[in-house]
């Protein structure tokens, strides 16, 4: 008897893949789960036909509410209802409070500086809250697909740093879910649009979600998906539009100190007005006060545009920087892909269209496009598409390196390097008999450690006690596909090694994300001057250290006059190197070198004499 092939309308009759994997867009405002079924990628609805799950979690004495129910009760119970938790991921409490005012939560700081929400269910951190959002998405997928998932691909903003990425993986880990990969949201969007299928050239992905903004410049060439440059802001999104409108309404209604409940209702109303202004030139905002009084105010589209104009222009400035970093011009960009619900705002589309000089792609629902791309990638990673030649090459947004003598930065992996990547460099000891070496891993573009971001410190012990410069320590930086860094230091002769996986206690602050690159360009000339000075000071210290050891060992080879001349030159170098004149230090080193030429020759002669002592010509 022949088997009937049954497929859903509009889909192929190919049987469902036996390896179950999904893509999850863990968003600031809403989250979605998508899968490839019968060869077609699409988001999966819940039993009420809702595709998106509000990223809202409410903690009560009875239990935990997630999604629509939590959102519905958020106005009456704001202290126990966590919204936009993605903005808290991997960031310090002080950083969060400096960026967003009027938070209704009772917050505490954990031992490592991370925020903790105090709720009726007890204390929870952003990772645990994120896990609660992931839980119904995973459950929905397994119920719909009819089996246990082999893994998930979770999308993150390209600008997420190590702490934020690790927090996202840890949230999935709390559920026992295997993370196949963290995928940058803009890259996922490009996959969803099928821009890898035959098209070649430069693509811009403009991703403005609820809490984050990313711009990625991609080059597509013969199946290779390379990210040329990334930029953005991990604390700029539609939520900020809501807060600006919220502040505007507070001012119009002269509400100086609204209660937490009223504040939440007003924020919800601000979001409704924002969304309604997408298709209307004027919308009436209304709110009922705690005493029952109802207030109304007409908000014109022009007024809303004025409120958000500076933020939208800020995203365009990021686009300009990303193009410069990628080494391409506006004219070279073939397509501009719009991602994220906030790209529905007319002013956003208008300014992006104007900047790139072409109408952006919006045919796929901007709220679903990222999850769909993640599903396609998950399908590939579990082996359901072995014929796929899609290759994703993400890049590092900031350089990684280590501190060297004098507080200098030696960059090991440069900014915009394609990942995954492994790079190594050899270093040596500074002092005779040195048996340990401390490593300080830093991130940034500046020349001095003080101007970069500290990531981690570790120590390599067990180095053979050799002369300065004789030991060889190989330092290897490895960055995996998720952008997580591990650093290993190994002494080559013994094989002794030490390593560390970098998981910063919290992420970059808003100011750091926006200014690190600008600072490096603005201070480039001054940084080089400071580096040259530091290098001369390190060299002076090395020369003095080496010469002091030589005098202690072989001073008998010198006359009193010769020794006095050398010591005077050493004192002069020591005095000059305490000042900030690189040229003077260099000249003092040269003067000391000239005064020690005869001493060096005498030491060489003496070493040869000692080596030949007691040996015959025949034995030599």
From Swiss-Prot:
GO annotation, biological process: iron-sulfur cluster assembly
Superkingdom of the source species: Bacteria
Xref: SUPFAM superfamilies: Actin-like ATPase domain, Heat shock protein 70kD (HSP70), C-terminal subdomain, Heat shock protein 70kD (HSP70), peptide-binding domain
Database matches in Pfam families: HSP70 (PF00012)
HAMAP family in alphabetical order: HscA (MF_00679)
Function of the molecule: Chaperone involved in the maturation of iron-sulfur cluster-containing proteins. Has a low intrinsic ATPase activity which is markedly stimulated by HscB.
Protein family membership: Belongs to the heat shock protein 70 family.
Name of the featured protein: Chaperone protein HscA homolog
Organism of derivation: Shewanella woodyi (strain ATCC 51908 / MS32)
Gene that produces this protein: hscA
């Amino acid at each position: 008897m022949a088997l009937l092939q049954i497929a859903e309308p509009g889909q192929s009759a190919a049987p469902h893949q036996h390896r179950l994997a999904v893509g999850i867009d863990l968003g600031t405002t809403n989250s979605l789960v998508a899968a490839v079924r019968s060869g077609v990628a699409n988001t999966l609805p819940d039993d009420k036909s809702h595709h998106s799950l509000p990223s809202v979690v409410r903690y009560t004495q009875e239990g935990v509410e997630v999604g629509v129910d939590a959102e519905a009760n958020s106005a009456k119970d704001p202290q126990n209802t966590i919204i936009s938790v993605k903005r808290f991921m991997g960031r310090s409490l002080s950083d969060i409070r400096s960026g967003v005012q009027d938070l209704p939560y009772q917050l505490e700081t954990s031992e490592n500086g991370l925020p903790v929400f105090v709720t009726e269910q007890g204390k929870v951190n952003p990772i645990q809250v994120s896990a609660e959002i992931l839980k119904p998405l995973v459950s929905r997928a397994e119920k719909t697909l009819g089996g246990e998932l082999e893994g998930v691909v979770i999308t993150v903003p390209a600008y997420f740093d190590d702490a934020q990425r690790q927090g996202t993986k840890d949230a999935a880990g709390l559920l026992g879910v295997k993370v196949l990969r963290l995928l940058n949201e803009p890259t996922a969007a490009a996959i969803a649009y099928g821009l890898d299928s035959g098209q070649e050239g430069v693509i811009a992905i403009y991703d403005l979600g609820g809490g984050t903004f990313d711009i990625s410049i991609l080059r597509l060439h013969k199946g290779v998906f390379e990210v040329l440059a990334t930029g953005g802001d991990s604390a700029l999104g539609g939520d900020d539009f809501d807060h600006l409108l919220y502040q505007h309404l507070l001012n119009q209604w002269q509400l100086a100190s609204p209660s937490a409940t009223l504040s939440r209702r007003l924020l919800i109303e601000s979001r409704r007005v924002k969304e309604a202004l997408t298709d209307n030139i004027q919308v009436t905002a209304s709110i009922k006060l705690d005493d029952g009084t109802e207030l109304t105010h007409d908000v014109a589209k022009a007024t809303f545009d004025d409120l958000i104009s500076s933020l939208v222009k800020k995203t365009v400035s990021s686009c300009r920087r990303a193009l410069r970093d990628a080494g391409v011009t506006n004219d070279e960009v073939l397509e501009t892909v719009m991602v994220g619900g906030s790209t529905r705002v007319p002013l956003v589309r208008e300014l992006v269209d104007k900047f790139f000089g072409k109408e952006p792609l919006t045919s796929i629902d901007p709220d679903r496009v990222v999850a769909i791309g993640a599903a396609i990638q998950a399908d590939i990673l579990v082996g359901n598409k072995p014929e796929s030649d899609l290759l994703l090459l993400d890049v590092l947004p900031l350089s990684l390196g280590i501190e060297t003598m004098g507080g200098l930065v030696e960059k090991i992996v440069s900014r915009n390097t394609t990942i995954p990547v492994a790079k190594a460099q050899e270093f040596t000891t500074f002092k005779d008999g040195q048996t340990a070496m401390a490593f300080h891993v830093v991130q940034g573009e500046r020349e001095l450690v003080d101007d970069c971001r500290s990531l981690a410190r570790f120590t390599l012990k067990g180095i053979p006690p050799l002369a300065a410069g004789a030991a060889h320590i190989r330092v290897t930086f490895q960055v995996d596909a998720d952008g997580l860094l591990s650093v290993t230091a190994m002494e080559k002769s013994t094989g002794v090694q030490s390593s560390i996986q970098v998981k910063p206690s919290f992420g970059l602050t808003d100011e750091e994300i926006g200014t690190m690159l600008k600072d490096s360009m603005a201070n480039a000339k001054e940084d080089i001057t400071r580096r040259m000075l530091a290098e001369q000071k390190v060299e002076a210290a090395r020369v003095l250290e080496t010469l002091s050891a030589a005098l202690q060992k072989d001073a008998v080879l010198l006359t009193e006059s010769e020794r006095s001349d050398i010591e005077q030159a050493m004192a002069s170098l020591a005095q000059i190197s305490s000042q900030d004149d690189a040229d003077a230090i260099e000249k003092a080193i040269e003067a000391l070198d000239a005064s020690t030429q005869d001493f060096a020759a005498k030491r060489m002669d003496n070493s040869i004499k000692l080596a030949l002592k007691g040996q015959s010509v025949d034995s030599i």
